[in-house]
Swiss-Prot record:
Pathway: Carbohydrate metabolism; D-tagatose 6-phosphate degradation; D-glyceraldehyde 3-phosphate and glycerone phosphate from D-tagatose 6-phosphate: step 2/2. Dihydroxyacetone phosphate binds at G181, G209, A210, S211, N230, V231, A232, T233. Binds 1 zinc ion per subunit. Catalytic subunit of the tagatose-1,6-bisphosphate aldolase KbaYZ, which catalyzes the reversible aldol condensation of dihydroxyacetone phosphate (DHAP or glycerone-phosphate) with glyceraldehyde 3-phosphate (G3P) to produce tagatose 1,6-bisphosphate (TBP). Requires KbaZ subunit for full activity and stability. This is D-tagatose-1,6-bisphosphate aldolase subunit KbaY. The keyword Plastid does not apply. Homotetramer. Forms a complex with KbaZ. Keywords: Lyase, Metal-binding, Zinc. GO terms for biological process: carbohydrate metabolic process; D-tagatose 6-phosphate catabolic process. Belongs to the class II fructose-bisphosphate aldolase family. TagBP aldolase KbaY subfamily. The lineage of its organism: Bacteria, Pseudomonadati, Pseudomonadota, Gammaproteobacteria, Enterobacterales. Zn(2+) binds at H83, H180, H208. Its EC number is 4.1.2.40. One of its GO terms (cellular component) is cytosol. It comes from Escherichia fergusonii (strain ATCC 35469 / DSM 13698 / CCUG 18766 / IAM 14443 / JCM 21226 / LMG 7866 / NBRC 102419 / NCTC 12128 / CDC 0568-73).
Length: 286
């Protein structure tokens, strides 16, 4: 087994009407928790790391862990660079073995976003690395990324069509009303906008900010063409909440083999639910 490009996973998902879950990782325990469930449920998976992730644990260490677990669990997996903003940073990580990258130029005007994404696509495609980009701007907070409500805006379908044609990007993250983090007010997803984007864009579509989104809403986006669903905040909350509860019951506890496993088990329940919502159970061939 090996680390593969997300292109192959997403093409199959698009052809067969399901979505591939993309879970953000932070350390060995989070990687292991996610893959234990994906292996059991035979679900394809994308392990996503933000620039902050790779400051906490070196890319080479994460890559080695993922490669080892791919063999242990007998399943291919994709290691994905989430919300990266620099071609030089992506170039270095691709040369180290990563085969999936998101270049986030959504904070730039359209022409500058196109120029940046096209430069990344040209390089990555020469290395069999797939590229995701974002058009529109999600609000909220994820790791070191913070976007206030005034700076957020939704994806225009016709601009999305032009963007994909001009850049050659492999998948497109669309802004349709979700946000990074948890929701402080009523969530309103623009399903009609998503349907209009799907009509004019033929590459796989990506839903960012899927934490705290009702399951039926996520399923509806998949019906309308989303093939990659990103989950981050819910995983961290489950892990941290379980560890806090363990220490509340075991104030003298100090053995990470116990409290880390409690956190992992809580995270696994979130992973299990998201796989079911994505419809990706048994989508890995034996």
């Amino acid at each position: 087994m090996s680390i593969i490009s997300t292109k192959y996973l997403l093409q199959d998902a698009q052809a067969n009407g399901y979505a591939v879950p993309a879970f953000n990782i932070h350390n060995a325990e989070t990687i292991q928790a996610i893959l234990e469930v994906c292996s059991e449920m035979r679900s394809p998976v994308i392990l996503a790391g933000t620039p902050g992730t790779f400051k906490h644990i070196a890319l080479e260490e994460i890559y080695a862990l993922c490669s080892a677990y791919s063999t242990t669990y007998n399943m291919p997996l994709a290691l994905h660079l989430d919300h990266h903003e620099s071609l030089d940073d992506i170039r270095r990580k691709v040369h180290a073995g990563v085969r999936s990258a998101m270049i986030d130029g959504s904070h730039f005007p359209f022409a500058e976003n196109v120029k940046l994404v096209k430069s990344v696509v040209d390089f990555c495609h020469s290395q069999d690395c797939s590229v995701e980009a974002e058009l529109g701007r999600l609000g909220g907070v994820e790791d070191e990324l913070s976007v206030d409500a005034e700076s957020a805006f939704l994806t225009d379908p016709q601009e999305a069509k032009r963007f994909v044609e001009l850049t050659g990007v492999d998948s497109l993250a669309v802004a349709i009303g979700t946000a990074h983090g948890l929701y402080s007010k009523t969530l309103k997803i623009d399903f009609q906008r998503l349907a209009e984007i799907r009509e004019v864009v033929d590459v796989p579509l990506v839903l960012h900010g899927a934490s705290d989104v009702p399951d039926e809403f996520v399923r509806r986006t998949i019906e309308l063409g989303v093939t990659k669903v990103n989950v981050a905040t819910e995983l961290k909350i489950a892990f941290a909440g379980a560890v806090k509860a363990w220490f509340a019951e075991n104030p003298q506890g100090n053995d990470p083999r116990y409290y880390m496993r409690v956190g992992m088990d809580a995270m696994k329940e979130v992973v299990r639910n998201k796989i079911n919502v994505c419809g990706s159970v048994n989508q890995i061939s034996a």
